[in-house]
Amino acid sequence: MPLLRSNYNPSIIFKSGFFSTVYSGLFRHLKINQDRELIYLSDGDFLDLDWGYSNTPTKKVAIILHGMEGNAQRPYVSGVAKYLNLNNYDAVCVNFRGCSGTKNNKFFSFHSGQSDDLVQVIDHVLEKYSYEFIYLKGISLGGNIVLKYLGETSSIPTQIKAAMAVSTPVDIASSSNELHRFKNCLFHIYFIIGLKLKLKKKQRQFPSKISRLLLWRIWTLHSFDELYTSPANGFKDAADYYDKSNSLQYLPKINTPVLILNALNDSFLSETCYPYVIAEDNPFIHLETPKHGGHVGFILPGKTYYNELRAVEFFSKFD
């Protein structure tokens, strides 16, 4: 598939990747009506799903996955859901384990390769509802999960028509290295503070499995993955976790239409997160790499952001 030429051209102030990333995360506020549904998983844990609906009955639904240290209420998620609702799509925003405001039941939490939870969400939607068209949209870490699912799953349900991944670190190891660079120090601090707060709650929940000493040893995202994420989820170490969870290795196997939207000035992404060669060889992968946008920025005048417009434009081709 030829690489897509992007039409995204923001105003001067939003040509800065840093400012776009910060602005969209801190200064956007949305109102959206949603209903929460709790579903139980096969291992005894649960997920909270936040549903928003089209004003008219529809057979179309989008399943939306958030990023690291996010949840279904973040503006970059609810903005997508709201715009989809306005365009006759229902939208179900998934809160990963431990991200909905209620601690999950298990020692392990969510991670960037946890596509088996997405499988159970899809199965739930198929079994309980009568949608004929299902679309997937993953943002950042959620995008990696969507792409991994599409590439590793041998039999995709026929109702899944297309997908989109935004600001997605398809190569987790190299993106982790980018987050540890000085240019991302403020974001790195933000992420590790949030993750450690959750881990402290997990330590009180499972004191025999997490020592207070371990909490003091975690000061970086890599040490968090090395000392908690990896052992809690059955990986040998952080390198093994990154290797088995990254979606880059699965992209050649994808046979569902998917749009990958990664800005060139996204400071979280490494060079390998722009899979030009794979996209050229795989007719199902549409790769759009605008010059601007930052990490989950893509700001436009008005209330709707560029990645939200692109989701509706892309999905509507497969209705």
Positions of PLM-derived features:
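Short beta-strand element of the alpha/beta-hydrolase
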Residues: K59-G67
